[in-house]
Amino acid sequence: MRSFIKSHKNSNSLDGSQSRWNNSEVPNVQRSSADSFNYSGSTVISSNSNTVTSMSIPNNLPNSKNYSPKHTPSFESFHRLANKIPSKLFKKSSNNALNATYNNSLHLGESLSSPPTPRTINTSTDAIQKVRSTESEIEIPSIKGTITHSWGTRSDTGGHSIIVLNEPRSSLSGASNSDYSDLEPAARISGLKRPSIVSIKTNNSFEEYNSTPIITEEEDLKNFDSKIINPSTPNDINAVKYNNRKTQIIGNENLFRTSNLQNKVRKHFISPLENLNENVLEADNKQGVVENVQRKKKVPNLNASPQDTIDGNRSRTISFAETSKTLPQMEGASDADGESDSCSETTDDDDDDNTSKFSFEYNRPNGRTASMKYYSKPEPVNNIYIDDLYEDENFDENMNYDEDSLDGFEFPSNKFDYGNENSDENDDIQGHENYVVQDNNSSKGPKLKSEAPKKVQTYNDLFDLSDDFDYDPSDEYQNETRLIHEMCEDGEASQIDNMMVDENIISPQKSLTSSKSFNNSNVSKSSPLIKPLETPKKKIIVKPVASFADIFNLDDEEDRDFKDDDSCNDESDGEYVLKDPFNIPGGKNLLNRHKSLKKNSSFSLKKIPSNGDSIDNNLMDKKLDKYIVDINKSIKKHSDIPDLHFVPPDNSSDIILPKRSQSLKYHDLSSILDSDVPGSTRDLFFIDEAEEDSYNVKHGLTEEEYLDEINNVPEDFYFSDSEQDMSPMKSPFRRSNTGSFRRTHSFSGKPIGAAKDNTPVKSKLEIKNKTVTFFNHPWTPNSQSGFSGKSPKKSIKKTDNLENSEEEHLLATPKRDDSSAYGFSTPDRQFRKPTPEYLQDYSLSPIQEGYSSVDNSPR
């Protein structure tokens, strides 16, 4: 500290003395390596040029050893103080940073307070070597290597170039070095340069880059390779980096403006002929597209001779690949025009299979760039597997089974001709006697009759069975006709010839307007008519519901039959109603046809007769009236096969209507929905509450039985057993209140809104030093006590039942006098002494400590 004060005093005595400046020259003095700083001179880098100027110390100094420039004494004293402090606090790297900081302040101080006659000295290699020698003693020695191979284009110089890693390069030197390559980190490069100079040089390089004239490719490649390998000045380095940066950011507008250094597309490619080439290429591509479309649309002529094909039938085609190869095209032009890579191919001189597909930049701190070429891989098609069925098993993309390929099978979708517009024209032909009805599949050729499967006689015949046998609807037709003949053999064979069976129901593939008889002698146009078989039907006579008691006599099956028999008897609104289609032969087929025809909106019903003029007279029987369906009226409503609906009966004698004096209930009101819903609430049985109550009284049904059933009380539970035993222990209330109490407390597990414990109440009370036990002692009421009452007795009463007249044992209410009732009696103001029996019954005896009835009681 004393040396610091002493040096500070000496430095202050030298300030402001102009007499100390002498004309004698003082050589450049360099301090020792311990001071690690040179005060002999300073260098200043001018912003307008790349030259480095050195300012020397004036020669007329009296004492060169004690010389210190202005504003430097504080630094000198601080530097000495820092050398005396141990090196652990100030490491060598931090010391170098301080030296660099104060070196800059020294240059600024000398530039501001310079002597009157300074002398400038040009830069020389000796001065630069001295500065480098001082830094080489401190910094890490450099590492040299040799470039053996590189990506991209090789230089014309050839040979192996030497690279130097971590070269101790001073920021003061601006001379070119052929051995040097800028491979230092980006932070060090940016720290060695001033921001103002870098920004000025960047702008200058951008202007020079845009204003450069068009040069040849060879000269441009040589200059570019020389700049990359041997960058002479920071200006060239910045220009190369800026160009590389511009090549990374390429848009639609900058595609033809910037020079792509990586792909070597030079400026001489960009010329005024570029727009013309694009127009020609676009026109050729459009022509090729049109010709390819015309080629695809052209149907090949199978009957044409080979000579005709050679002469003129061969169409000219131009593919996209051939079009792109005929004209020079830049890489990326197809992307600008919106064309895919699969349709166009670019021809480049540098495209070779041996070259790398990666792009590499020289003199970049981070090395290889992230830009690379990606190749799209075709995604494999996922196969669809459904229970070991592959995608070729007639499944479409929506996982629906395709039935179009199964035309030979009998499916509902293959039974009708959709949109047969020529049905009107063929009506006259169908009326001919020799008219033959053909199937839909007749145009495909004669139908081969499938072999009938063998009958199963042995176990091995089971393996010969197959599902591939075609279903023939004629088999079903023959089976039905055979059943009809068998059923009608008994005296009804004469009606078979007159009975018309609609063949469309049995064989839907045939014409809908033609009908055949069993003898195949008469073919005429008629509406579909079905005559039912008159089979005897046994009806169960059910007593109609006239009272509330009749509801319990109904069975489920009887109730259903009762509703079905009386549902449809008469005609309503002039419409014919089909009674029960499932009881008629072929009625199910009619409903199935009705469902299938709803899907086909193009089905025509123009030729179905609306009146009965064309029907034969022998068919107009009264028995058939109820089964004839008037199709004309139903077509107006639904434009389809008529719906089979049921009409409620007109006579409602079985329904009990409410009296006018009674209150109207909710289910008696008719709503709009009642007319649409069959079997609405107005058809339900009316329940009279007065009649219901009389029925319950008549049969002895009370509300207590319903409550016991709700509370899950067992049927064999007899309340009198517990009532007789517990009657003395009950509270002495009136007997009339016990019924309501039992209705509310008849079940112990009835949910209440409180927490409870189902464990029985303990009969002992445990205290700190003893246990008190309570015993339930049965006692008989004594006449001397203040209580009076009688126990209930059983009485047998015979009741005559109106229906079964059986004797029932009922628990009668106990007989009681008017004077004696349950409850406290009025005292007679005569108090008697308690008898010993009373004291024995109602007094608590002392607890025996020796033995106790409770095992855990204390002794």
Curated annotation (Swiss-Prot):
Protein name: Zinc-regulated protein 8
Species for this entry: Vanderwaltozyma polyspora (strain ATCC 22028 / DSM 70294 / BCRC 21397 / CBS 2163 / NBRC 10782 / NRRL Y-8283 / UCD 57-17)
Coiled-coil ranges per UniProt: none
Biased composition (Low complexity): 40-57
Biased composition (Polar residues): 10-39, 58-72, 302-327, 776-788, 842-859
Acidic residues compositional bias, start-end: 334-353
Basic and acidic residues: compositionally biased ranges: 797-819
Keywords (A to Z) from UniProt: Cytoplasm, Zinc
A single GO cellular-component term on record: cytoplasm
Chain spans, region Disordered: 1-72, 296-374, 722-758, 776-859
Similarity remark: Belongs to the ZRG8 family.
Tagged with keyword Nucleotide-binding: no
Subcellular localization: Cytoplasm; Bud; Bud neck; Bud tip
Protein role: Involved in maintenance of polarized growth and daughter-cell-specific transcription.
Superkingdom of origin organism: Eukaryota
Keyword Phosphoprotein: no
